[in-house]
Regions:
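Short juxtamembrane and helix-loop transition motifs at transmembrane-helix boundaries
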Residues: 1-8, 29-39, 54-68
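Membrane-interface transmembrane-helix boundary segments in multi-pass integral membrane proteins
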Residues: 3-14, 171-179, 191-264, 288-291
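Membrane-embedded alpha-helical segments of multi-pass membrane proteins
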Residues: 11-20, 71-82, 97-100, 113, ...
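Alpha-helical transmembrane segments in multipass membrane proteins, preferentially the mid-helix core
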Residues: 20-26, 82-88, 149-169, 182
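Membrane-interfacial loop-to-transmembrane alpha-helix junctions, especially the N-terminal start
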Residues: 32-46, 95-101, 173
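Aromatic-anchored segments of alpha-helical transmembrane domains
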Residues: 47-56, 104-116, 177-189
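Membrane-proximal helix-loop-helix units in multi-pass membrane proteins
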Residues: 88-153, 158
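Short, highly charged, low-complexity non-transmembrane loops/tails of multi-pass membrane proteins
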Residues: 274-298
Length: 298
């Protein structure tokens, strides 16, 4: 059975499809007006919102999730994006729009490079014991499509000059990410309070564990080791849970600041290169032109 595994043919097929679709969309929008592009992107966000909500009708959810409402809540970072991006798209708040752009592009790219859900036998905190068919399992297609749109819209916003990133605001992005993790934690508490998630599973990293807010699955290896470098020992215990687990959300604060900061810096070097080099006093050393627009003070 064809399944998606890291580095195999089907893994690269999905990446190729994503790149091809991006080129086709760019070609389609090339001679369209800016107004058309603006509403076209909003239409994509609305479509993705429907894709996110509509997943409760997919057999994998119908057969393995007792309370389907838990799967259309703020259960992870990308779910928050799918739900909130149609609203953030219209915001005048530059910090919120920065978050939308940076997290959208980054999470979309990371998902295609490391499609954990598509490669795993786990679903909703359960090990189903079988891998998903690369193309016949509709959840796989939905997974890739939704994350692709989460990437595509912010990418096109930047490509067509609908938003501008600024190195002066870059420091805010990791803290916005931490705020979203807190929202996910509150969402999980509410799901438990309403009886939609068993209390015994609330803090268990081997169950739902949305966006790893309760720790990593298994030992500190792989992803756990990458995140765990910046986690002090006192945050590697959870006083509210008897089993092995990390302190909810707080254990992710330093990793979010470090890795989120690096991603934000990379975005600035791509989209606000001149101002970023000036900010770090590198422009003269790299012998780049000095003619740049003034850095906005926000």
């Amino acid at each position: 059975m064809p399944i998606v595994q890291f580095g195999n043919l089907y893994y690269f097929i999905y990446i190729f499809i994503g790149i091809l679709l991006t080129l086709l969309v760019l070609r389609f929008l090339k001679h369209k007006s800016q107004k058309y592009r603006y509403w076209f992107l909003f239409g994509l966000l609305v479509f993705n919102f429907i894709v996110h909500i509509g997943k409760i009708f997919i057999p994998m959810y119908q057969n393995n999730v007792e309370y389907l409402i838990t799967k259309v809540s703020f259960e992870n970072i990308c779910a928050v994006s799918a739900i909130l991006f149609p609203f953030l798209y219209f915001t005048k708040n530059k910090t919120l729009k920065d978050y939308m752009v940076m997290v959208g592009i980054a999470s979309g790219v990371i998902t295609f490079l490391f499609p954990v859900d598509a490669m795993s036998t786990r679903f909703n905190g359960l090990d189903l014991g079988v891998y998903r068919h690369a193309f016949r399992e509709i959840e796989n297609i939905r997974f890739y499509l939704s994350h692709y749109i989460i990437f595509l819209v912010p990418f096109l916003m930047m490509h067509y000059g609908m938003h501008e990133l600024s190195i002066k605001r870059a420091w805010r992005a990791p803290f916005m990410l931490i705020l979203v993790l807190v929202i996910i934690f509150i969402n999980e508490l509410l799901m438990t309070l309403f009886g939609w998630v068993p209390k015994s599973e609330l803090f268990d990293p081997n169950k739902r564990n949305p966006s790893f807010i309760f720790g990593v699955v298994g030992s500190l290896g792989g992803l756990g080791m990458i995140l765990g470098i910046f986690v002090p020992s006192f945050l590697r215990v959870n006083p509210f849970y008897s089993g092995p687990a990390f302190f909810p959300v707080l254990w992710l604060v330093l990793p979010a600041i470090v890795y989120g900061g690096l991603i934000a810096l990379l975005m600035m070097l791509i989209y606000d290169r001149d101002h970023t080099l000036r900010f770090f006093h590198l422009k003269h050393k790299l012998k780049l032109p000095e003619e740049v627009e003034p850095i906005e003070h926000e």
